[in-house]
Amino acid sequence: MKTKITLFALLTLTTSAVYAEDVSKYQEESRAVAMPFLKNLAAENKKAVEEGGPGSAIKVCTEIAPKMAGDISRQNGWKLTRVSLKVRNPLLGTPDAWEQKNLQEFEARVAKGEKVETMEVAEIVQEPAGKSFRFMKAIALQSGCVACHGNAEQIPDNVKAKLSEEYPHDKATGYGVGQIRGAVSIKRPI
């Protein structure tokens, strides 16, 4: 009996160590994909605003960002998306239960003083289709984003009109610089 307990404890410790090692490895790989995605998205946004004003950045979110996310997803066999508790595009940005829980936890962490830029979460989860590695990296609202995501008085009338046309059910406004706009979410089967 003592041997069985010792063997069980040893297996549990070994499994825990392997699990932690896998999560760490997958987290690094996911971060290596998420960070360039965010950097490239910011560059596309900046370019659009410089070329055509704040209203031009809407095209980045409606066309360029989904294409970038789709390309990355196909290249890696993962699902990469942007999600938020205040969704602009319900077809692409609505969080699943895991994402919603973690976005709410991010908000609680901000309330305790943690910096948005450092926030991420990673874990292996059991789902009906099997095990998946899940990763989320919080997105902080930048100063250049308030023209589309700020308070009503910060959003120019032409941008409001375009947003109303493109996103009739838009909830992604009312943010301030530094607040959590949402997160990049990666889901990969393991």
Predicted feature locations:
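Short, linear, compositionally biased motifs with a strong N-terminal bias
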Residues: 10-12
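Detector for the c-type heme attachment site
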Residues: 146-153
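Extracytoplasmic c-type cytochrome modules immediately beyond a signal peptide or single-pass transmembrane anchor
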Residues: 20-142, 154-190
